[in-house]
Each structure stands twice: as C-alpha cells, then as structure tokens.
C-alpha cells in the first residue's frame, strides 16, 4: 500500500481495520447522511460493474481477496445499501482477477460515472471493436 501511494499520501486518508466487522462498526458510527453506500465487488454480483447508475458520490467500494472475496456478512450489508457489482471474467479459464486489477477497474468506472470533475461523459458509448470508421 505504501509503495502504491507514491507521493500522494498528503491527498488521501488510510485507516486500517482489524477485520470487516471492525470496519462495519466504524462505518455505522458515521452520521447516516454522510455515510454513503457499501458497494462490493464479487463474482457473485448480480449487476455489472459498468451498469448505468451503479455508483453515487460517497459510495464505499469493498474488494475482497482473490481467494475468498468479501466476507459473507459484507455481501448482506452491501445488498442492503449499495449492491454487489460483478467484473466479468471467463470462469472456465480464470478463477479470479488480481486484486489490484479489480480495484483499478472498479474505482475508475465509479469515477467515470460520478464524473466529479464536471466533464461531459457519454455513458451510452460502447466501443465497436473490429469495425472501421
């Protein structure tokens, strides 16, 4: 984590929790109007990571380990607040994505949809690979 933060540490805030339950207790203690939703990423998710309107400002994105994913109680909490997103993979040949890849895909899709910089974004655009312009 320290290496990944490079020289951006002054711009961010990192808090380490002993367990998911400790995190959830911390999250519940935040004033409800400022808390945001819990959104998990899992191969068991029912909604695509790039589904329209999948993210809102203030969302907390949860990623689990490559082996075990997010804890079962996190699935329950996320379903109740923000849902569970799925990043598609070919499960016949791939068990899971590397955690850093999943985080990159999820975070940048959330930023694209929320568009906090005020740039216009065409959420209907989907590249047509293999077709000539």
Task: Label each PLM-derived region with a short phrase.
Residues 2-133:
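Post-transcriptional modification and biogenesis factors for structured RNAs
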């Amino acid at each position: 984590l320290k290496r990944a933060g490079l020289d951006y540490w002054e711009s961010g805030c990192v808090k380490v929790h002993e367990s998911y339950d400790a995190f959830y207790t911390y999250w519940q203690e935040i004033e409800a109007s400022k808390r945001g939703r819990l959104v998990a990423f899992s191969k068991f998710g029912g909604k695509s990571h790039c589904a329209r309107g999948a993210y809102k400002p203030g969302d907390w994105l949860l990623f689990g380990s490559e082996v075990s994913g997010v804890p079962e109680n996190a699935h329950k909490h996320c379903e109740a607040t923000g849902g569970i997103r799925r990043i598609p993979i070919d499960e016949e040949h791939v068990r899971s994505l590397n955690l850093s890849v999943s985080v990159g895909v999820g975070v940048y899709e959330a930023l694209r949809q929320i568009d906090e910089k005020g740039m216009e974004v065409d959420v209907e655009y989907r590249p047509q690979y293999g077709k000539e312009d």
